[in-house]
């Protein structure tokens, strides 16, 4: 016991209820810029962060406690009705990424693509389903083997999903793919070859998910994902096991083309008028992947 505020333990591994004693928040600001003749433009800003629950003051910025944070995670413009071939789709430009899909009880993601800037199209009706596609870029810190020195590398990601494919009553399928490559300079490659920096390896992830909704509310989602290199390594983490390219923004590890598979089942069911039963099961296995934990 701390004889004070509650303390978190094993956030992102044992589950969020009862272990996440923090004040994380998302705040979205949205302003319509244009709306005429079936065409619409909105400016969107998303802020997220944490407000500490230990002290009455909660100033943001550098502080000894290090518990109060805030960032602009999204800042983009989204439009509808401007593309003749996809008038119903959302076309966006700016700091944004494809939609995240969360394993709710664990605060892990089955789909997550971090982005510093990019362009994308969402909810484009093609055939029986809809297409989401995004091309985004992000800089990552590539470390040397001492984990003391780093260099900044630009990466580019293409994220493609075909979703909302109807199967049977209240059941839909999604098929997804993602590929991440680096745009490295000659000096960055030289540091990897001669100065002990970890070699960048392109990484990919493919998968599918099936979502079944229930008559009385609730749903269950089953997903199958396979990945290689650094994304596969993140499948093996016991905390924060989302499909990241890096480990907390740091790129390191000997990635040698190994692959990993992850199976998930999650959902919730309404029992009567007053109770909700939730579930989350994740199973991962791989071969020749780098372990961030050991």
Show which residues each predicted segment covers.
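Beta-barrel outer-membrane channel/assembly domains of diderm bacteria
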Residues: 1-86, 124, 163-165
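Transmembrane beta-strands of outer-membrane beta-barrel pores
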Residues: 2-3, 33, 47-53, 95-99, ...
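Residues that define the transmembrane beta-barrel architecture of outer-membrane proteins
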Residues: 9, 19-25, 68-73, 111-117, ...
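Outer-membrane beta-barrel domain signature
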Residues: 14-18, 56-68, 104-110, 144-151, ...
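Residues on the lipid-exposed face of transmembrane beta-strands in outer-membrane beta-barrel proteins
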Residues: 25-31, 74-79, 119-123, 160-164, ...
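Short loop/turn motifs that connect adjacent beta-strands in outer-membrane beta-barrel proteins
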Residues: 30-43, 82-90, 124-132, 163-175, ...
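Aromatic- and glycine-enriched pocket-lining scaffold segments that form the walls
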Residues: 108-211
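Detector for outer-membrane/organellar transmembrane beta-barrel domains
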Residues: 168-182, 191-193, 197-294
